Amino acid sequence: MDVPQLHAIILSAGAGRRLGYPKALLKLNEQLMLPLICQAFKTAGCQHLSVVIRAEHEDLFLDAGLTARELVINPSPDDGRTSSLLCALQRVSSEHHLLIHSCDIPLISSDAIQQLVIQWLSVAAPEKTIARLSSPGGKGGHPLLVGREFVPELKKFEADQPLRDLLTHNKDALLNVTRAGDPGPFLGINTQEQLELVASLLDDAR
């Protein structure tokens, strides 16, 4: 079987209004999280990476080790999160399957991503399957793995259209992959309180 072409898209252009600053600038223990998120996807075997950012952050992330080829500038980031996805989709080949992730879920690990990919590959038609990690209690997590046959549908989305519409329209194609003992795929950071919670979990794990 041919090696699947996995294209990770990291959505990182949000203004972070509730957080108080752009989410791409999230730090834990004084370390920028976005480069670590990108490394997790590379370690998991993603051959392609598109990191969608605001124009004013380009130099910062070039200095942090990301490449110009990996960075995608969203010229209108306040149009909605899906506007960032649409920017990245311009780089996606018809052979690419997508792993869509948000930078405000920083504790994703390469192991979790690999578990998702392995389970997705085990189904009869991965290209026609959408997969996500889920908690033992059924809570959906991240990233979202989208088989290549759904990419044309995504390209028709409006800039302010929620990504969950893809799941709503294709319920029979959804594969939930249970991930136990790992809060990383389910912990989003939208407020200072959530940031402090995640930081405390990291401190407790030391």
Enumerate the language-model features and the residues they cover:
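N-terminal nucleotide-binding beta1-loop-alpha1 segment
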Residues: 1-21, 191
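Conserved beta-loop-beta/alpha segment of the NTase-like Rossmann-fold superfamily
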Residues: 78-153
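Residue-level signal for inorganic ion chemistry
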Residues: 10, 22, 34, 49, ...
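Short glycine-enriched, charge-decorated loop/helix-capping segments at active-site entrances
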Residues: 22-27, 74
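Conserved N-terminal catalytic core of the sugar/cofactor nucleotidyltransferase
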Residues: 35-100, 110, 118
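Short beta-strand/turn micro-motifs composed of small residues
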Residues: 12, 52-53, 102, 134
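Short catalytic helix/loop segments, enriched in acidic residues and glycine
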Residues: 26-38
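Conserved alpha/beta core of the MobA/IspD/sugar-nucleotide pyrophosphorylase nucleotidyltransferase superfamily
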Residues: 2-4, 152, 156-206
